[in-house]
């Protein structure tokens, strides 16, 4: 199996390593002529389809299209692809005009300009820093229960409301507690034409203190 079948990750890099093309493109403007100094970049492994396959011997990662030189600063070609995981980087060199990939032997070294390298930390994902927990928004309740002296058409406490549910001091046309209501169901202090508690009602069913023409409790009259 050729190297390209073994190490090629496809175009567009993968997480935690290097795929094919794509990745650390960009950088500084193209430099004309050889650099003042060069650093060891990789060792020759074998040729592959006209390119040179190298194993990186530098702790940093080269730019794509970065010029590659021999020790005497003669340009061999440019970085074409970067391959392999972060702890074992490989790269290929696309040879320049007049340079043959088969002219090199295993162990030959290639060099690069210092300004064409990126630190390996640029390719390592940074851990997420846990921040303080976000405060939870308390939902506001719409409306509020009424206290004493309820509103009309709502739920009241003492001193009931008209047309609603009342506590003490009943409501007209509703269900009342003490202090009955007219035409409704009353507690103590009955209502006219309804069902009363103590203090009966006229024409209804009364509790204590009977009612006229109704059914009385204690002290009732027929």
From Swiss-Prot:
> Which terms in the GO cellular component ontology are assigned?
box H/ACA snoRNP complex
UniProt feature, compositional bias: Gly residues: 1-26, 146-222
SUPFAM superfamilies in the record, alphabetically? Translation proteins
Which region ranges are annotated with the description RGG-box 1?
A: 4-27
Q: Where in the cell is it found?
A: Nucleus, Nucleolus
Q: Keywords for this entry?
A: Nucleus, Repeat, Ribonucleoprotein, Ribosome biogenesis, RNA-binding, rRNA processing
Q: Tell me, which GO biological process terms does this entry list?
A: snoRNA guided rRNA pseudouridine synthesis; snRNA pseudouridine synthesis
Query: What would be an example GO MF term here?
Result: box H/ACA snoRNA binding
Q: What is its main location?
A: nucleus
Q: Which Gene3D superfamilies match?
A: Probable tRNA pseudouridine synthase domain (2.40.10.230)
InterPro entries given for it? Answer: Gar1/Naf1_Cbf5-bd_sf, H/ACA_rnp_Gar1/Naf1, Transl_B-barrel_sf
Q: Where is this region: Disordered?
A: 1-35, 124-222
Q: Where is this region: RGG-box 2?
A: 148-222
Q: What top-level branch of life does the organism fall under?
A: Eukaryota
Q: How does it assemble?
A: Component of the small nucleolar ribonucleoprotein particles containing H/ACA-type snoRNAs (H/ACA snoRNPs).
Family of this protein? Belongs to the GAR1 family.
| Summary of the function given for this chain in its UniProt record | Non-catalytic component of the H/ACA small nucleolar ribonucleoprotein (H/ACA snoRNP), which catalyzes pseudouridylation of rRNA and is required for ribosome biogenesis. This involves the isomerization of uridine such that the ribose is subsequently attached to C5, instead of the normal N1. Pseudouridine ('psi') residues may serve to stabilize the conformation of rRNAs. The H/ACA snoRNP complex also mediates pseudouridylation of other types of RNAs. The H/ACA snoRNP complex mediates pseudouridylation at position 93 in U2 snRNA.
Q: What protein is this chain from?
A: H/ACA ribonucleoprotein complex subunit GAR1
Gene that encodes it: GAR1
């Amino acid at each position: 199996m050729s190297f390209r079948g073994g190490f090629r990750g496809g175009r567009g890099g993968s997480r935690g390593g290097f795929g094919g093309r794509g990745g650390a493109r960009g950088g500084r403007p193209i430099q004309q002529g050889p650099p003042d100094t060069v650093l060891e970049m990789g060792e020759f492994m074998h040729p592959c389809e006209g390119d040179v396959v190298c194993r990186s011997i530098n702790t940093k990662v080269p730019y794509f299209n970065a010029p590659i030189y021999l020790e005497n600063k003669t340009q061999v070609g440019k970085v074409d692809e970067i391959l392999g995981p972060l702890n074992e980087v490989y790269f290929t060199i696309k040879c320049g005009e007049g340079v043959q990939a088969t002219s090199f032997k295993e162990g030959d070294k290639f060099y690069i300009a210092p300004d064409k390298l990126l630190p390996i930390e640029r390719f390592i994902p940074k851990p997420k820093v846990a921040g303080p927990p976000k405060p939870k928004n308390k939902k506001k309740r719409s409306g509020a229960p009424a206290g004493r002296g309820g509103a009309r058409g709502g739920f009241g406490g003492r001193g009931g409301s008209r047309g609603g549910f009342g506590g003490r001091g009943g409501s007209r046309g509703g269900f009342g507690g003490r202090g009955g209501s007219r035409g409704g169901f009353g507690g103590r202090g009955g209502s006219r034409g309804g069902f009363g508690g103590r203090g009966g009602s006229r024409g209804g069913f009364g509790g204590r203190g009977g009612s006229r023409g109704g059914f009385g409790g204690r002290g009732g009259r027929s």
